[in-house]
Amino acid sequence: MSTPLSSTPPSFSLAGKLILLTGGAGLYGRGLAAQLARAGASLVLASRNVAALETVANEEKALGHEVSARFLDQDDEPSILRLRDSVVKEFGRVDGLVNNAVSRPMKTIDGPLSQWEASMKTNATGLFAITRAFGEDMVRRGSGTIVNIGSIQGTVGPDFTLYEGLGMNALPDYFFHKAGMVNLTRYFAALYGPKGVRVNCLSPGGYYNGQHPTFVERYSKATYLRRMADDNDLGGPVIFLLSDAARYVTGVNLPVDGGYTAH
């Protein structure tokens, strides 16, 4: 029997890496912030809600982690460029970008087109703009990695039977822009790969957030692991993709869904 390692292999560590995480206080973001910080990253959180990010940063700093908060309006390219320039000026570089920010203004299929357009401004145009801005800086330095947080809803169609009778729904804008994210990942991986920059996508499955028990039961039965994802399920795969352990991994969409899309 092999003797267990006393510590994580260095290639899996984020120690010494400056990671920017967008949307660092929400459903995925809070758990990711904690796990990235505990993996050794120097972490910058960015979103419109700086007050919420400051709370997260202070909680993590109390644990001895290096975490700070910045304002970002992903709808606004000048805001993206100001964020990039200020972080690079302060820290010298950004080693990893985690595109986790998302806006979901469309609540029903019958919603006004203005809701669709608002969704695309953040989740499509904004995603492109921030990836290009930070990607160009990584290319100039010849290294870096980008992880896009997608969804299984970007790779499979909706199962409306999961929502029947529950007042819940699957909304078209989310399916549209998460599917686009997967192929935009491949585009940037092909463009930036020869210049030393890796780009990958991670697509979580259903994430438990206090949903109706009937939905939780239905969804869980559709997975091989018979449960929804929780805060402990995303950090490890994201850390792997950001780390040097994944140095030969680029252009992939990694499902983290308990087997939901393996059917």
Model-inferred region functions:
Residues S2-S13, I239, T250-H263:
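Short C-terminal tail/terminal secondary-structure segment
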Residues L14-V44, F188:
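Canonical Rossmann dinucleotide-binding motif of NAD(H)/NADP(H)-dependent dehydrogenases/reductases
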Residues D85, T122-S143, Q153-G154, R186-A190, ...:
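Amphipathic alpha-helical dimer-interface segment in Rossmann-like NAD(P)H-dependent oxidoreductases
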Residues D95, V102-S103, P112-A129, S143, ...:
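Catalytic Tyr-X3-Lys loop
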Residues N100-M106, G259:
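Conserved NAD(P)H cofactor-binding loop of Rossmann-fold oxidoreductase domains
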Residues K107, V147-G193, G206:
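Catalytic loop of short-chain dehydrogenase/reductase
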Residues K107-A118, F160, Y219:
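Substrate-binding pocket helix/loop in short-chain dehydrogenase/reductase
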Residues G193, R198, V249-G251:
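Short, small/polar-rich loop/turn modules that mediate ligand/substrate recognition or access, typified
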